[in-house]
Every structure is written in C-alpha cells, then in structure tokens.
From Swiss-Prot:
This is Vacuolar fusion protein mon1. It comes from Aspergillus oryzae (strain ATCC 42149 / RIB 40) (Yellow koji mold). InterPro entries: FUZ/MON1/HPS1_longin_1, FUZ/MON1/HPS1_longin_2, FUZ/MON1/HPS1_longin_3, Mon1. Residues 46-56 have a biased composition (Pro residues). Its main location: membrane. The lineage of its organism: Eukaryota, Fungi, Dikarya, Ascomycota, Pezizomycotina.
Amino acid sequence: MDSEIKNQLQDSLGGNDDSKDDITCSSKSSPTMAASSVRERSTSPEGPPPPLPPRPNTLNLLDEGASSSRTLRQSTQSALQSRATTAVSLTDIASHDGGKESYPARGLPGTLRAKASLSHLASPRGSDTADSASVKSSVPQTDFGEVENVFSDFVATESGPMQHDSTGLLQFPEFQADDVDDDFTEEFEPVGDVGDEGENEVLENWKSKRKHYLILSAAGKPIWTRHGDGGLISTYIGVIQTIISFYEDSQDRLNSFTAGDTKFVIVAKGPLYLVAISRILESETQLKLQLEALYMQILSTLTLPSLTHLFSVRPSTDLKRPLQGSETLLSTLADSFTKGSPSTLLSALECLKIRKAHRQTINNALLKTRTNSLLYGLVVAGGRLVSVVRPRKHSLHPGDLQLIFNMVFEAEAVKAGGGESWIPVCLPGFNSSGYLYMYVSFVDLREDAGNVADDTATKEESVAVILISTDKERFFELQEMRNSFIEQLEKDGSLKIMKEAIDKGRPKTTDIVPGTVLHHFLYKSRGNVQFTMSSYEPDFSSVSRRRRLMSTYNNLHASIHSKHAHVRVHHCVSQSSTSLAWVTPVFQLYCVAGPNANRNALAHSASKIVQWVQQEEERLFIIGGAVF
C-alpha cells in the first residue's frame, strides 16, 4: 500500500529524475500534451517514431478521478443551490484566484473515495484501543446525520482548483526567490515621533517597514495605520485616495498594482478602503484575505449597521473615536499576518491534539453544566481549540473564531479583574447586525497557581473558557456555569490532560516519519476546515526563519491555486528549500525540506504524513463537537 501511494506521487512529480536547476517548478502534466508532441515528431524526415509505450496506470487513475469529480458537481449542484444559509461564506473571504465556483465537500461518490482520498491506505485500527472504533476515512460522508461538522455551513463554499481537477501543466516561468536575507527584528518596532527625532529620520523608519496596512474613508480621512500616525502618513493617504478615485470615476475598481518589488492591494468595503502594501512574498489573494480579516475586526467593534449609519449621516466622519481601544487588536492581528499565519493562509483552525475519549469527556462536561442562555461554548488551551458546544443547527465561522482568539489572547484588558471579562462582540460570520455577549475566564495551568489565571500567565500556560450568549444580563449565570465546568474538569482529570498535551507540543517531522527529509508540513482537512502542522523546532525557531517558511508556503499556495493551475501535485526548488504541495478533494498538504532533498524521498515522506493524519484524525481534529 505504501508503495502504491508513493508511486502515484512519483508519477505526479515526473518520474524518478532527481536533477533540478537552481530554481525550478514542476507539476503533473496532461497526457494529451505528450501525445501531441509525439505527433509533431512523427512528421520529421527522420522516419516513423518507435511505438508508444503503454500509458501508465496513474494517468488513468487521475483521468477517472477527474470524470468522477465532474459527475459529483452535477449531482450536488441543485442541492447546494437550494440550501439556505445566513452565514458569511468562505467564498467572500477565502476565494482563490481560480474563480467563484463552489467546491462541494459534503459528499463524494464511491469511485472517488478510494482514489482521491487514499483512504484505502489508512490502517483499519486507530492509534490505540480506546480510539480504534473512532478512526474513520477523511472523506466527508454524504450524510452527517445528527453529528454535523463544526464548520458545516462553510465547507461547501470553499473554492479552489479542484472544480476542474485537471492535470494540466502549470505554466510558471520563474519561481520567486525566498526571503533569505529578511531580518524581522526591527519590523515591529515603532517608527518614533516627529517631535523626538527629525522628520526625515522618522519617515525613513516608516519606509523601511516591509509591510503596511492602511485604513481610510472614502472621503480620504485616515482611520488606522499599523506604522506611524495620521500626521505622518496623511500625504500618502491623499495619494492613495486620488488613485482610487481616478479609477472609480472611470467606472472601474482598482484591486491591486505592483511598483518594483512592492505590491499594493486595495479592498473597498462600503465607506472604507483597506490597503495592504507589502514587500513580502505574498499573492494578491492572500493579502485580500488579510484585509478582509481586518475589516471583520472593525465590524466586531461597531457592527455593520452602525458603520453604515455613521457615514450615511456624515460622510467625513472620523472613525478614530468609535474605534478607540480597538487599535491594539488591529495591530496584533496585522502583526500575526506579517509574521506568517497558517490559519489565515489555509482559512482553517488548529486544534489541540488529545485522545478522542478525552475530548468526549470535556464535551460531556460542557453539556452537563450548560445553561439555557448559552449559544456557544469554547475551550481553548495553549491557543488551540479543545472543545466546542453549539446548537444543532448553528455552525461556527472560522473568521469569527480568529477574531475571538485575537481578542481573548491579545487584548491586555481581558485578563484584568481576576481573569474574568464580559465583552460585547459582533461576530460578522454569525450576524453582522448585532452584538453577542462573551464571558471569558482563564484557568492557570501552572502547578504553583490557583484556578484563576493572573495577567502573568502566557497563552501557552492557561486554558480559556469562552461562553457566548445573546442576552447581556446573563453574566452571573455564565459565571456559575464556568465554575461548575472547571470543577468537573478537575474531578475527571481533564485539566491535567490538557496541560500534558500543551507541554508535549506539536510533533516534529522526525517523530512522525523517522529519518525524513521534511523540516515542516501543513495539512488541512478540507471537510473539517481544520489544519494540523509539525513543530517549528529546531529549524524555524526564530521569527525571521518562520517568516521565510511562510513565504515558501505562500508561494506554494499561490502557485497551486492559480487560476491557470489545474494540478494536484506541485514541486518547487529554490536556493534555500525544496517544497511540495499536494491537493485532493479531501486534503491539502504543503511540506518543506532542505534545498538538496531527494524528490523521491520527499514524495515518500509526504505519503507517510497523509497516512499518519488519517490514523490520528479524531485526535487532531474536532469532528462534530458537542451539540444540543
């Protein structure tokens, strides 16, 4: 079985040829291209060509998978169109360059399950006896029954190249160089004030930043900037507003442009313009996703009706005062994008790896202590999701959870007052028109600390209990639920289990595949809208090395999701790394090795990672969650 999956990957990578140029990219090409080239050679004066060798079985397999994918789209199109939802879909915030067609991930035909998902290679047994009955194929089933996916409303709208499912050759003439020399030690330092230093020196500090985010109104008023202040950037704001207005006067909309090595991306949202200026290796689509997330952060404070009303009454409204206090959240969110955010790149969420039985125990404790006013309940440990309790017919939006995580772990005021907070918040994916009310409490996992965390506990040292209600008068009711829930966790040992899982950390690639050439990988389960990854240690421990790694992933992601790229396997070599992207209807795998890594060894390690994830699926991902 291992040899079968390995052979498929090797065929997709172009055989056993290990030769590579200084910077190269390769993808699985279409058999029709080979046939056409043979016909061209047959017309040469050198005589008839030798007979064609038999077509490899791998190409037949890929062609059959493509036809199955087309049959799937026809059979599910009417069901997807008739399904009502009020949630914001990933088409709005995570569409690739390939277009707006929806990818139906709810069910796959039987002919695709064994071939596209490679589920026939998964062990029938789980990781141990307790999980043996829980390990299931990573192919989303046709009918979820009573246990739906945590993000079920958003799976069907994920777009990508799999609509075409072709094996056409990727025309990518030159792979961009890595951020080899980038040093981010000063990227997040303040630029200074004009009063303290000379204006020219402050301006040079501002220009030296590799990435800027600007938010301005349609009237040209600066609202927020990651670096500097309104006075420093007012001239540049005026230039940007003039350029945008010029295109709008021509009945056109400016989305992006490039000047030298700098990319400018503009997103218009009603009365607001959000602008990203980047010299980091990121695609237009990736920068748009980041601007969309910043816009959702603004809506979480103001709500869409309030924002619209402010500018309808007074178009020149200064939004700084209504957003006062949210600047820190915008800045921390922007900095996470600059450092590199796998969650934003993949539009997915990471969960804490624990045994299925342990996760079910935590779910049962949430359901047992639940109050009638509870809408959503979340348990987050070490910055990763552990458990979710939700209504049966309501799903969570990944963008909303990203906002919650950013607010809970980055706002300094949240841990004040003994680790308890009561926060009004708008979750745009749930309802952009109104507020929900969020009770947040931290539990310190340090052995010398009590149950309640203080403001010295880091994100990795505490468990956050997040309880969300539609009623602003339910603080004490949710506080009582939290106390009962923590008491239950202590009784059944769940707090200790979470602490051990956090201390253990993410696995290294060599822990999963001994002797592997891989240094790091990202794996996204498309059906669960969740991802897992290996440890950054020891190769990517610094901020600059981690940024370089994310630049490699950005290039891989942009290449394989390009609108002209209908490939499943994409292999690239640059001066600092060898990387591989492998995309199927079931998963996305991105992995990075050293610059001299053998192509066959890379394919072998990738297949081993896929098998490991399938065996550990219900430890790595939350499937269904607790519903009521």
